[in-house]
Amino acid sequence: MEYRLTTPCTVQDLAPLKAGDTVLLSGVVYTARDQAHKRMMEALDKGETLPFDLEGSAIYYVGPTPERPGEVIGSAGPTTSGRMDAMSPRLLDLGNKIMIGKGKRDDAVKAAVVRNGAVYLAALGGAGALMAKSVQTMEVIAWPDLGCEAVRRLTVKDMPLTVILDAHGGDLYQSGPAAYLESR
């Protein structure tokens, strides 16, 4: 199935999604990679507020390249999500609802997705220029010293994504190969 979603999202918005579904995501998406996640954990440990509201948020694991003249953003392909696994459950427990990246997630992340009615969506790896076409606006909102890993607020329209982990425990990286082998 194909779904159109607009952030921020609720448990009810995400409940119909199943692993393998296509999502066209619009609204605000925040960028945060390894170093930004570490800074968010440090801020939370100190009782500080984060640079954006986690409730219903979408976080894209991306470090975009510099934009060319006349462009909103440079290439914006996903980075490997596993590097955020140690920190993702905490953010999910605090209200983050959508994680966007590529690659498998660990069991703690999978459990946190189900526990919080969240989803993990995959962006097409190797297609950073395609992903960038969905971005309408971009603004650095925190930690500019991190360069490409600074936290950005993106406004996106119809960003093409695939549901990898759904709120019901579905995992496309398990069900996809199994369905293929069964069909042979």
Predicted regions mapped to residue ranges:
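Feature captures the catalytic cores and cofactor-binding loops of soluble hydro-lyases/lyases
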Residues: 31-32, 36-159
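Short, structured beta-strand/loop micro-motifs enriched in basic residues and often containing a Trp
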Residues: 1-9
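Active-site/ligand-binding-proximal alpha/beta "capping" segment
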Residues: 88, 164-184
